[in-house]
Amino acid sequence: MGVEISLDPPVCPIQANGGVSKHKMINHTDRHMAYKVKSSNNSNYSVNLIYGILKVCDVKELVITRKPGKPQADKLIIQYCMVVDENTDPKPLFANGVPPGELSGETVIKLSAAE
């Protein structure tokens, strides 16, 4: 397993007093990939995409928003798995964590809020 899904840029430099960071979420595979985006700190961070399908070699814009708050070591986790049908509802797939499969896993993005 390599890097099936990545973010560009791979880091999120948002100030502790709040802000927005835009990233490209990229599917590097020749398969449709379902994803779920999780945050270690839902009080301070939100994203525009939580569940979805990245089609073959697709790119979507992920917008990360931070509310003002104390800086700490937070992270975003993009869980993913391969799906055959691009019209699959991704939400039930992640009800028990990352589904097992040939192409499944997680991509971790460090969120570094600077003061």
Curated annotation (Swiss-Prot):
Protein name (database record) = Uncharacterized protein ZK1307.4
Q: Which Pfam families match?
A: Motile_Sperm
Domain MSP as annotated: residue spans: 1-115
Q: Which InterPro entries match?
A: Ig-like_fold, MSP_dom, PapD-like_sf, Sperm-specific_class_P
Q: Which Gene3D superfamilies match?
A: Immunoglobulins
Tell me the superkingdom of the source: Eukaryota
